[in-house]
Amino acid sequence: MHGGCYRTGNGQPYARKEFIKGKPQIKIAKFQGGKKGEYDCIVQLCSNEKTQIRHMAIESARLSANKALEQTTGETGYFSVLRIYPHILLRENKMIATAGADRLQEGMRRAFGKAVSLAARVKTDYMEIGRASCRERV
């Protein structure tokens, strides 16, 4: 599964989880981090283009942002909120490319595919991918 295949959201998103057996679990551990309170500045992460972001990429961005904020402001010096939720199912119709594969696969017949990952669609200049408030200037 390559990320470039799922970067653009073509067509209607598929989010009907009740019809699929073996749904992938969401990899995002927490949607809020730090300590709630009043803060001086707000740092926001926004997207430059309309795209789909996989849940693994959202989790890695959250981890790196929280680590950077924790190093500069301390454990209780910030509060971060993740505003997007990956609810779109990404499916893949796996193809076998070895000798004798024509006897094992059906090609495009019954090509619904298996659910392999989750993603969130983000619009251009969407300001709520992540928001962090901190007491000091970062």
Label the model's feature ranges.
Residues M1-R137:
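Ribosome-associated RNA-binding proteins
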